[in-house]
Amino acid sequence: MDAKIKPLRAGKSADARTDFQPAELDPSEFLAAAVQPDQPRPSRAEAEAAVKTLLSYIGENTEREGLLDTPRRVVEAYDELFQGYHQCPAEVLDRTFGETAGYDDFVLVRDISFTSHCEHHVMPFYGKAHIAYTPVERVVGLSKLARLVEIFARRLQTQEHLTAQIAAAIDEVLKPRGVAVMIEAEHTCMSVRGIGKQGASTFTSRYTGMFRDNPAEQARFMSMIRNRG
């Protein structure tokens, strides 16, 4: 298959791209729970009724024995799969430790497994996240980075948005010298439905601070992710 390279838009030069800066996220996306206690929401009974409607839509008999409890089970599963809407990312990163003996290199946690759901088809995508940050005097507990991934993953997402949210939360709360996030994932909306290409992986990355400004640090981050020796 031949690739077609689109020309730059009129008035744009290739050099202009080097000045690109990523868009800033709204802090409400990563500093607080997505659902507030006083936010109006459908009742549990209404949610179960909606599941029953979908079962009827696909042609099922919702009164048969195997489906009698399915609406309840689906809503309970949603409560678990999407609990990230009720959790606060900033609180996870709030506790830090200052006993670092002057450590001044980046901290990397790789292979953080996760499962999320695509906001376009509500189908799972899953994979691994790799996170590095260069602390300023204080560090956060390593498990907190995994917990942060879990909170954002348990919401409807795109992989690009998930990557950006993780980086933005670390950058804003910890205020390190730089953050690097890479996510690799397989999307069932592409492998199970649609084009049906199993095994295809999608990679996304986001860099801030020293990682964004220094290609050598990006390269070292990537090397440490890939080096399994």
Swiss-Prot record:
Pfam families: GTP_cyclohydroI. Disulfide bonds: none annotated. Residues 1-21 are annotated as: Disordered. SUPFAM superfamilies: Tetrahydrobiopterin biosynthesis enzymes-like. It catalyses: GTP + H2O = 7,8-dihydroneopterin 3'-triphosphate + formate + H(+). One of its GO terms (biological process) is tetrahydrofolate biosynthetic process. GO terms for cellular component: cytoplasm. Zn(2+) binds at C118, H121, C189. InterPro entries: GTP-CH-I_C/QueF (IPR043133), GTP-CH-I_N (IPR043134), GTP_CycHdrlase_I (IPR001474), GTP_CycHdrlase_I_CS (IPR018234), GTP_CycHdrlase_I_dom (IPR020602). Keywords: GTP-binding, Hydrolase, Metal-binding, Nucleotide-binding, One-carbon metabolism, Zinc. Pathway: Cofactor biosynthesis; 7,8-dihydroneopterin triphosphate biosynthesis; 7,8-dihydroneopterin triphosphate from GTP: step 1/1. One of its GO terms (molecular function) is GTP cyclohydrolase I activity. Its EC number is 3.5.4.16. Toroid-shaped homodecamer, composed of two pentamers of five dimers. Belongs to the GTP cyclohydrolase I family. This is GTP cyclohydrolase 1. The lineage of its organism: Bacteria, Pseudomonadati, Pseudomonadota, Alphaproteobacteria, Hyphomicrobiales. The gene is folE.
